């Protein structure tokens, strides 16, 4: 533990806790999307009849649980990375390296987030869905150390965020059976996460090379766009397999996957390795793209599952 020697005028513990948890950004959305996709695909593959009110409660539970998980482990990540962050231009202003909050205060914040995360998950989603979160929590614990020992830490991050597919799936099915049916969506999401995080990592490549931080952006250097093209094609293929197996309608195929396919080459061609901010802009574009696909998935689910069922119920009442 360390005691901060930063002048009080520069310290702001409340803001430090807020920023450690990334509550000032939209990054938590990236973890929410796969859980919603998992729920939508499960409803299609299991041919589940949905009612609007229970489904909205499920969405709220997923949002609350994923957000709390993200807050906890982003705090943990920054505790582990604080010495490295001092040497990375983009990260110097984070709460710990800037002295906004001390290490001991950050550790207390992390410890407080853990029971909050468990309570929210259990209370809003129940024990079955909570079991689906366990792999996500385990991988989130080891992720900060992967960038020190392996040249592709993005793969672990892909498994973490992609793993959110399973709690969403279980939230619809109510059990842990047939999780293998969700694997195409898991791998599609994981490949997308690796894809956008490689863009993100290009921002820090010069600093990472100096301090020995490992990433695919560092490993591949100027050849990184070849990997991005492979990952782009792979995610589109796996999303298509998922949609086919879930018998999704033209709403998803045209408005969802069609738009996604247009964005992938645009991202890759837009990357300028000489501009440090280029990768960050494309990363933010992927946050918006994920939100768009989530909206299309919910629209498709509502039109095909909820609306059709409501219409059928109205017809039965009229008869």
UniProtKB/Swiss-Prot annotation:
Mode of membrane association: Multi-pass membrane protein
Keywords attached to this entry: Magnesium, Membrane, Transferase, Transmembrane, Transmembrane helix
Cofactor(s) it depends on: Mg(2+)
Principal subcellular localization: membrane
Gene Ontology CC annotation, any one: plasma membrane
Stored Pfam families: UbiA
GO molecular function, one term: transferase activity, transferring alkyl or aryl (other than methyl) groups
Subcellular locations according to the entry: Membrane
Transmembrane segments: 28-45, 48-68, 106-126, 127-147, 152-172, 182-202, 224-244, 249-269, 289-309
Pathway: Secondary metabolite biosynthesis; terpenoid biosynthesis
InterPro entries, A to Z: Prenyltransferase, UbiA_prenyltransferase, UbiA_sf
EC identifiers of the protein: 2.5.1.-
GO annotation terms (biological process): terpenoid biosynthetic process
CDD domains, sorted: PT_UbiA_COQ2 (cd13959)
Source organism superkingdom: Eukaryota
PANTHER family: 4-HYDROXYBENZOATE POLYPRENYLTRANSFERASE, MITOCHONDRIAL, PRENYLTRANSFERASES
Function: Polyprenyl transferase; part of the gene cluster that mediates the biosynthesis of macrophorins, isoprenoid epoxycyclohexenones containing cyclized drimane moieties. The first step of the pathway is the synthesis of 6-methylsalicylic acid (6-MSA) by the polyketide synthase macA. 6-MSA is then converted to m-cresol by the decarboxylase macB. The cytochrome P450 monooxygenase macC then catalyzes the oxidation of m-cresol to toluquinol.
Family (UniProt): Belongs to the UbiA prenyltransferase family.
Note: The macrophorins cluster contains a single gene insertion (encoding for the terpene cyclase macJ) compared with the yanuthone cluster that produces the linear compound yanuthone.
Name the UniProt record assigns to this protein: Polyprenyl transferase macG
Naturally occurring in which organism (per UniProt): Penicillium terrestre
Gene assigned in the entry: macG
């Amino acid at each position: 533990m360390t005691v901060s020697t930063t002048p009080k005028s520069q310290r702001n513990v409340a803001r430090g806790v807020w920023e450690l948890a990334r509550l000032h950004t939209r990054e938590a959305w990236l973890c929410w999307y796969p859980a919603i996709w998992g729920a939508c695909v499960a409803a299609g593959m299991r041919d589940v009849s949905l009612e609007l009110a229970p489904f909205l409660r499920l969405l709220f539970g997923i949002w609350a649980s994923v957000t709390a998980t993200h807050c906890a482990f982003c705090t943990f990540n920054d505790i582990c990375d604080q010495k490295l962050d001092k040497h990375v231009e983009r990260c110097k202003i984070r709460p710990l390296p800037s002295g906004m909050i001390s290490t001991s205060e950050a550790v207390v914040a992390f410890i407080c987030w853990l029971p909050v995360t468990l309570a929210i998950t259990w209370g809003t989603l129940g024990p079955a869905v909570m079991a689906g979160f366990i792999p996500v929590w385990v991988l989130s614990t080891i992720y900060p150390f992967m960038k020190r020992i392996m040249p592709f830490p993005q793969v672990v991050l892909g498994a973490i965020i992609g793993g959110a597919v399973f709690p969403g799936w279980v939230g619809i099915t109510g059990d842990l059976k047939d999780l293998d049916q969700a694997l195409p969506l898991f791998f599609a999401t994981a490949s997308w996460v690796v894809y956008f995080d490689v863009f993100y990592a290009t921002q820090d490549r010069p600093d990472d090379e100096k301090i020995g931080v490992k990433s695919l952006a560092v490993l591949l250097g100027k050849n990184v766009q070849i990997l991005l093209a492979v990952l782009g094609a792979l995610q589109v293929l796996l999303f298509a397999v998922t949609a086919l197996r879930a018998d999704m309608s033209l709403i998803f195929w045209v408005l969802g996957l069609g738009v996604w396919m247009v964005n992938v080459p645009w991202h890759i061609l837009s990357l300028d390795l000489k501009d440090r901010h280029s990768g960050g802009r494309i990363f933010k574009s992927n946050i918006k793209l994920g939100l768009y696909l989530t909206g299309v998935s919910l629209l498709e689910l509502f039109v095909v599952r909820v609306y059709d069922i409501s219409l059928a119920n109205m017809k039965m009442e009229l008869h």
